[in-house]
């Protein structure tokens, strides 16, 4: 949103890069049939660098957990007027307890609200656009002034780098997941169609929310959770309901993040697993409670986004030189799978 109309070009770049990366991970998983999803790093980068990237991905996931805790704190303070640290501390305590006790099924059940949150955010964005359509010119001017004054932070110096960084940090989350989706897919074409539809839907949602934020910037620029302010402008009850859904969404995201970090080093249920979960959960909570949510997002996601861009650049080179295709053909032959060019 801070790049104004240039941000729309950034969204198109995001769509192209998300589609490319998603299809790449999917195809690697489909043909290679990894025993463990993280083996994709070694395929893409070689054994030594792949191992480094694998451990870095775990570190990034830990940092993402800290961002979730900061987000819980920001939501609790902004909408529920909770004392500082209370919302984030409660969220961290519940997440640590759930991971230590292995109550992942609770997350599986509540996790089904994810699409509801996305749909609600899109609806709020559309209503906000309709309510503020006549403010486009003045809102664009104000956005430029706020960016120039530093009151609105930008992730990168230009929209192209911002788009690449955004795809980069999301990509680190999605690598192993999409490789596993490809591994289990019965039809490669159906799985590829799913990636395309997902990238399209995600990009449309970004477009809607970006326009909504620009049009409502006079009310949102000093808010850590802008969509909550937009919801409140529509109806206070809607904002409360959406806040609850956000907190549940943060919970269902934080638990798998913390579980992934601990599970990478220790077997679930062991004493070391529980001890490490407690330590990692508390350290992550301290970081999340100490730094402001918007500042933490700009630090964690932007820095990791640039690192993800390096991996993305290597993937493009790997595809352009034909190395990716060669590896998939060899894997298809090894696993008795018909290669689809």
Model region roles, listed by residue range:
Residues 39, 147-152, 213-236:
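Membrane-interface interhelical connector segments
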Residues 21-27, 131-135, 165-166, 197-229:
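Extracellular/periplasmic helix-exit of transmembrane alpha-helices
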Residues 95, 99, 117-148, 312-329:
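Hydrophobic alpha-helical segments and their helix-loop junctions in multi-pass secondary transporters
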Residues 2-24, 193-207, 302-310:
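Extracellular loop-to-transmembrane helix junctions
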């Amino acid at each position: 949103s801070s790049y104004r109309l240039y941000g729309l070009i950034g969204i198109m770049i995001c769509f192209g890069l998300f589609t490319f990366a998603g299809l790449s991970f999917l195809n690697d998983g489909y043909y290679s049939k990894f025993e463990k999803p993280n083996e994709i790093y070694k395929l893409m980068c070689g054994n030594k660098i792949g191992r480094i990237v694998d451990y870095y991905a775990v570190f990034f996931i830990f940092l993402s957990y800290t961002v979730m805790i900061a987000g819980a704190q920001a939501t609790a303070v902004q909408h529920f007027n909770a004392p500082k640290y209370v919302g984030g501390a409660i969220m961290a305590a519940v997440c640590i307890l759930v991971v230590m006790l292995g109550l992942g099924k609770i997350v599986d059940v509540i996790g089904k609200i994810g699409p509801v949150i996305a749909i609600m955010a899109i609806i709020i964005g559309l209503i906000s656009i309709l309510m503020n359509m006549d403010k486009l010119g003045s809102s664009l001017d104000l956005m430029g002034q706020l960016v120039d004054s530093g009151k609105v932070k930008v992730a990168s110096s230009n929209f192209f780098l911002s788009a690449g960084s955004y795809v980069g940090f999301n990509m680190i989350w999605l690598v192993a997941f999409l490789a596993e989706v490809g591994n289990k897919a019965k039809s490669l074409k159906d799985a590829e169609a799913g990636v395309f539809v997902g990238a399209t839907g995600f990009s449309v949602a970004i477009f809607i929310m970006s326009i909504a934020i620009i049009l409502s910037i006079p009310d949102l620029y000093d808010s850590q959770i802008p969509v909550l302010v937009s919801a409140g402008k529509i109806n206070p009850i809607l904002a409360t309901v959406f806040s609850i859904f956000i907190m549940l969404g943060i919970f269902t995201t934080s638990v798998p993040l913390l579980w992934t970090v601990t599970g990478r080093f220790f077997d679930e249920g062991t004493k070391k697993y529980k001890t490490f979960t407690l330590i990692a959960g508390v350290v992550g909570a301290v970081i999340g409670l100490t730094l402001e949510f918007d500042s933490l997002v700009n630090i964690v996601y932007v820095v990791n986004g640039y690192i993800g861009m390096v991996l993305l650049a290597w993937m493009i080179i790997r595809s352009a030189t034909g190395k990716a295709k060669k590896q998939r053909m060899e894997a298809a032959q090894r696993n008795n799978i018909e290669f689809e060019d």
